[in-house]
Amino acid sequence: MASTALEIVAFVVSISGWVLVSSTLPTDYWKVSTIDGTVITTATYFANLWKICVTDSTGVANCKEFPSMLALDGYIQACRGLMIAAVSLGFFGSIFALFGMKCTKVGGSDQAKAKIACLAGIVFILSGLCSMTGCSLYANKITTEFFDPLYMEQKYELGAALFIGWAGASLCIIGGVIFCFSISDNNKTPRMGYTYNGPTSAMSSRTKYQGGEGDFKTTGPSKQFDKNAYV
C-alpha cells in the first residue's frame, strides 16, 4: 500500500514537471529587456528560442523569427535540442509510468511492472536533466553578456520561461527519484515462511541396506520341505 501511494505521488509530481517543461517552448519571455524613457517605458524587447519581439509604448508587438538554423548561435541550437529532448523523454516516461504503476491493470506481473516503473523514473530524471541543462545554458549566456562591460549590444535579463523550466526540471527529477525509491520499497516485502507438518518418512528395518555393497538382504524360499508334502 505504501509503495502504491509513492507511485501515485511520483506520477503526479513528474507529470506536473513535464507540463511545466513543455509550456516553456511556446513561451515568449525567455529573456527580457526594457528601454525606459523619462516618463513611460518606450520599448520592451523579449525573445525565446524561435523569435525576437519588441513592444512599443502603445502595446503593439512586432516579432521577427530567427533565420535559418545554420545561421543561429550555437547555444540556441543546443537549447532547442535539449528542450525538445526533455519534452520527448517526459512523454515516454509518462507512458512507462502508466504501465508500471500497481494501480493500473496493464503491464503484466508485479515484477515486470516494477521494472517498467523504474525505467519511467530513470526517463523522468533524464528529462529533468535535459531541461535543467538547456535553461541553465541559456541563462549563462544572458548573464555573461549582461555583466560584460565590452558587450555593446542590447542586454537582456532572465525571463519567466527560465524559472518555469527550472521548476519543471526539478519536479521531473524529484518524481523520477520517488519512482526509483518505490521500487526499492517493493523489494522489502516480507516473505512468509511455511512449516511442513506432514508425517516423517521412515524406512522399515526390512528394507535397509545390508553390507558395504548396498545389496538388499533377501531371504529365499526354504529348502527344507516337510515329509508329508510327498505322498
Swiss-Prot record:
GO terms for cellular component: bicellular tight junction; cytoplasm; endoplasmic reticulum; plasma membrane; tight junction. The keyword Phosphoprotein does not apply. Keywords: Cell junction, Cell membrane, Endoplasmic reticulum, Ion transport, Membrane, Tight junction, Transmembrane, Transmembrane helix, Transport. It comes from the Eukaryota. The chain crosses the membrane at residues 1-21, 81-101, 116-136, 161-181. One of its GO terms (biological process) is regulation of monoatomic ion transport. Expressed in the inner ear where it is detected in organ of Corti, marginal cells of stria vascularis, Reissner's membrane and spiral limbus (at protein level). Residues 22-80, 137-160 are extracellular. Residues 102-115, 182-231 are cytoplasmic. GO terms for molecular function: identical protein binding; paracellular tight junction channel activity; structural molecule activity. The fourth transmembrane region (161-181), which is missing in isoform 3, isoform 5 and isoform 6, is necessary for integration into tight junctions. Can form homodimers both in trans (interaction between CLDN10 molecules in opposing membranes) and in cis (interaction between CLDN10 molecules within one membrane). Interacts with CLDN19. Forms paracellular channels: polymerizes in tight junction strands with cation- and anion-selective channels through the strands, conveying epithelial permeability in a process known as paracellular tight junction permeability. Belongs to the claudin family. This is Claudin-10. It comes from Mus musculus. The gene is Cldn10.
